[in-house]
Structure formats: C-alpha cells, structure tokens
From Swiss-Prot:
Gene designation per UniProt: gltX
InterPro entries in the cross-refs: aa-tRNA-synth_I_cd-bd, aa-tRNA-synth_I_codon-bd_sub2, aa-tRNA-synth_I_CS, aa_tRNA-synth_I_cd-bd_sf, Glu-tRNA-ligase_bac/mito, Glu/Gln-tRNA-synth, Glu/Gln-tRNA-synth_Ib_cat-dom, GluQ/Sye
Predominant location category: cytoplasm
GO molecular function: ATP binding; glutamate-tRNA ligase activity; tRNA binding; zinc ion binding
Species, as recorded: Bacillus cereus (strain ATCC 14579 / DSM 31 / CCUG 7414 / JCM 2152 / NBRC 15305 / NCIMB 9373 / NCTC 2599 / NRRL B-3711)
Span of the annotated motif 'HIGH' region: 11-21
Subunit structure of this chain's protein: Monomer.
Annotated protein name in UniProt: Glutamate--tRNA ligase
Length: 485
C-alpha cells in the first residue's frame, strides 16, 4: 500500500507573506489536494533574532485569504506536533546527542574570528571557502583547554568523504553533489539551537513528509539533509525544487525591489481579489494543458500535475496580474466592487467616511461606470478623477479634437440642450446629443468627440451619457463654457 502524500509549507516568521513564499505554499497545497494527501504548516522560528512580531499570524492570515486551508499546523494541531520548531528543542537534543555518541557529529570550539581568518585564507589562495575540519579529532587535553578558556562549542556533522549524493528531482530530474565539496557543517549553534538543515531533516522525517517542494535556492541544502537522513537510517523524501521568479529584466525577484509589489497583504490593501491572486500565482512556474489561463481553485486542484512544473524561471508580469484581476472583477456583483473601491476614494479624500443616501447612490453609480474597466479597487481613484475636479486638463490628443472647426458650434448647441434639461439622466442626455446632431448636421466622431473631451477631458472613457449625467449640470456647463470661451 502506497504511503499517503504528506507535504508541508514551513515559513519563518520573519515578515509578511511574500509572493515567492505564497507560490511555495500554493504548489504544496495543490499537490496535496490533487492527490488526496495532507498539507501541513510548520513554523520554522529558530532564528529568533530575525523573527518579527506578528510574522506568524500574518503568514497564516494571508494564506487563508488566498483560499488555502491545511490539515495540520500550529493553529489546528495534529498528531505530529508540535508544529513550531522552538517547541521541538527537546526532540532535536536527543537526536544530535545520539550523533555525538556515535561519532557522526563532534564539538567544534573555533571562534568566529578563527573561522573568518580560515575563510579569508582560502579565498586568497583561490579556493572555494569551506570549513577545513580543524576540530574533527580534538584530544581530551585540547577540549579541556578550550573549555578552560570559556569557549562555547557548536556541533558539526561529520561529512562522509568521497561520496556522491544524487537524487531525482521532481522539477530538475537528476541532481548530483559530491561530499568532498562540503566542509563539516554546523547542526547546532553555540546557543544550543539547531540549524536549519538539521531541524528540517528531523521534522520532515518525524512528520512523515513524503515530498519536499520548495524554491531552488534550497537545492544546495538537499545533500546536507540527505546526509542527516542517512546517518539515522531514515527514508529520504522526494524533492522538487521550483525555479526562481524573475522580474521583467529577467533578474531574480528581490524583496528590496520596490518597483514591484511583492507582498500578499499589499495586494489585498489595493483591492485585488484573492481568487485572482491565487490564479496568477498558480501559473508562476506551472502550466496546464492548453491555452486557457483562468481557472477556479477546484479546477486547479483537479488538474495539478507536478510533472508540468517549469524548468525555466517564472516571469512575474505585473500587467498580466492586472489583466487577470480585471477578468475576475468583471464577474463580481456591484456590491463587491463598491466594497473594494470605496475605501480608496475615502482614503484619497474624494468622499467622506459617512455619506448621505443620495451621495451613496451617486458614488455607487460612478464606480459602476468603471466596473468592466477596473483592474483593482484602488484604481478607481485615478479612473474617476474627472468627477472630483472643477476643471479638467486636456491630453494632447484631446486638444487636437477641440481644435476642430465644428467644435464651437457643436458645444454651443449642446450647452443649450443641457441648460434646458430639468433632470440629468442618461436617456435625456442621449436625446440632447441627437438634437445637437439634427441642429448642426454634425455626426459621428465630429459630434461625440468634442462633447466627450470638453466634458470629461478624455478621448476615451465610460459611457458618455452616463458620465455626463453623473457630472451634473453645473460642472458640465462650466466645462463647456471654458472651451467655448
């Protein structure tokens, strides 16, 4: 009988949920759900200095917002807990003490200064820096001497000599490392806290993880973890290392690159939809069969095949994300779109926090004008700018339109029609434009474009009669007058 698939997402609580980490979580989630397996969340919090207050809560909150759930973890429990590494220190202690007893690990008393001097010497000689194993075979006398000096040891794993470590990677196929390229590596720091590679190998085994899907920046950790598995006689899980995410310059996505929004929390704040972000991330380094790109969560679960994970870097295309979110925005009801947009108009000072019924209805109609066009909630501030200004500026293309010979005649006639209207409604404005056509003989672009540019300042935009109705009589007449002179 085959083992049940068990995968994990194991973030460090060092900050908010990044797009790259979200992708790792998502691919593990889809892999588990597709194969009726278990998805586990484990918190790797042993690097206490880097942990951020609220980091763990933020990770979990935004994974949930994206639509993921998990079977075991810090907040839901499970039979393989605890799921927070700082609560597993006794487990690690028993195991590294076992390695020490069997001579597969040893105490290293070298100071940071000695290690740095060794490293600098290797670089000066043109060698690849690695620990030279100086404290591998210390005598009892040397140990006593170091301890008398007050030196606190770290614990290093004794790397086997002349060994090949190969594994079949789910993404990269055959991957090979040679043990002679590694120095003996630290498995327990001087403060008694296990290092990443030791704790991860122990946790993955004890939690019965069958597949480890992670970013390929972890690939060099894999042979070290394999050595630890081997030292304990444990079965090695299957590894899959997903390619990097790159920006439009084909450089690795860096958290320091502020030209790209990279944290899930920021997308939520901007009024993006979780389903769209889920969809977009699922296609960052994985592709379905066929050309279709819009899928529901259930569709992704049904068709997810790890064999289709890409070997090439995944391009983070911000414009494509906007396009994708727009596809999802179009499907939302107006209430949802208002909910995503209105807070941004309040924040920009366009409307107050409390609105009269009349103002609520008006702003709802303004947002409705852009429902089909809007990429994300915050975009409403820029899109609807013309409704909140007394005067409009004309783009170069718009100015050319207003230079037409027929423009004064068309705009005067239209101003007369608007002046006569008792109620500014789209149907009445449509009728007014038709009346101008009859009166002046101008039609098509020669009729519509001057009216659009003079009233909205734009050559393209929402339905003209609806926009003019919402602008209101006073604003429209003022703008027409400004052009007529």
């Amino acid at each position: 009988m085959e083992k049940q698939v068990r995968v994990r997402y194991a973030p460090s609580p060092t900050g908010h949920l990044h797009i790259g980490n979200a992708r790792t979580a998502l691919f593990n989630y889809l892999f588990a759900r597709h194969l009726d397996g278990k998805f586990i969340i484990r918190i790797e919090d042993t690097d206490v200095k880097r942990n951020v207050a609220g980091g763990e809560e933020s990770q979990l909150k935004y994974l949930k917002w994206l639509g993921m759930d998990w079977d075991e973890g810090v907040d839901v429990g499970g039979e393989f807990g605890p799921y927070r590494q700082t609560e597993r220190l006794d487990i690690y202690k028993k195991l590294y003490e076992d390695l020490l007893e069997r001579g597969l690990a040893y105490k290293c008393y070298m100071t940071e200064e000695e290690l740095e001097a060794e490293r600098e010497g290797q670089i000066a000689r043109g060698e690849t820096p690695r620990y030279a194993c100086n404290h591998r075979e210390l005598t009892e006398e040397q140990v006593k001497e170091f301890e008398a000096e007050g030196r606190i040891p770290s614990i290093r794993f004794r790397v086997p000599a002349n060994r090949d470590y190969t594994f079949k990677d789910i993404v990269k196929d055959e991957v090979a490392f040679h043990s002679n390229d590694f120095g003996d590596f630290v498995i327990v720091k001087k403060d008694g806290i296990p290092t990443y590679n030791f704790a991860v190998a122990v946790d993955d085994h004890l939690m019965e993880i069958t597949h480890v899907l992670r970013g390929d920046d972890h690939i060099s950790n894999t042979p070290k973890q394999m050595m630890i598995y081997e030292a304990f006689g444990w079965d090695i899980p299957q590894f899959g290392h997903m390619t990097l995410i790159v920006n439009e310059s084909r450089k690795k996505l860096s958290k320091r690159d502020e030209s790209i929004i990279q944290f899930i929390e920021q997308y939520k704040e901007l009024g993006y939809l979780p389903e769209a972000i889920f969809n977009f991330i699922a296609l960052l380094g994985w592709s379905p069969v066929g050309e279709e790109e819009i899928f529901s969560k259930d569709e992704f679960i049904k068709m997810f095949d790890a064999a289709r994970l890409s070997k090439s870097p995944a391009l983070f295309d911000s414009q494509k994300l906007k396009w994708m979110n727009n596809q999802y925005m179009k499907k939302q009801d107006l209430d949802t779109v208002v909910e995503l947009s209105l807070p941004h108009l309040v924040k920009a000072g366009r409307v107050g926090e409390t609105l009269s019924e009349q103002d609520q209805a008006w702003i709802r109609d303004v947002i409705a004008l852009y429902h089909e066009q809007m990429s994300f909630g915050a975009e409403i501030v820029e899109l609807s700018e013309m409704f909140f200004k007394d005067h409009v500026d004309y783009e170069e293309e718009g100015q050319e339109v207003l230079n037409g010979e027929q423009v004064p005649e068309v705009l005067r006639a239209f101003a007369g029609q608007i002046e006569a209207l008792e109620v500014m409604e789209p149907a009445a404005i449509k009728a007014a434009i038709k009346a101008v056509q009859k009166e002046t003989g101008h039609k098509g672009k020669n009729l519509f474009m001057p009216i659009r540019v003079a009233t909205t300042g734009q050559t393209h935009g929402p339905e003209l009669p609806n926009a003019i109705a919402l602008l209101g009589k006073e604003k429209v007449l003022n703008r027409l007058q400004k052009v007529i002179g």
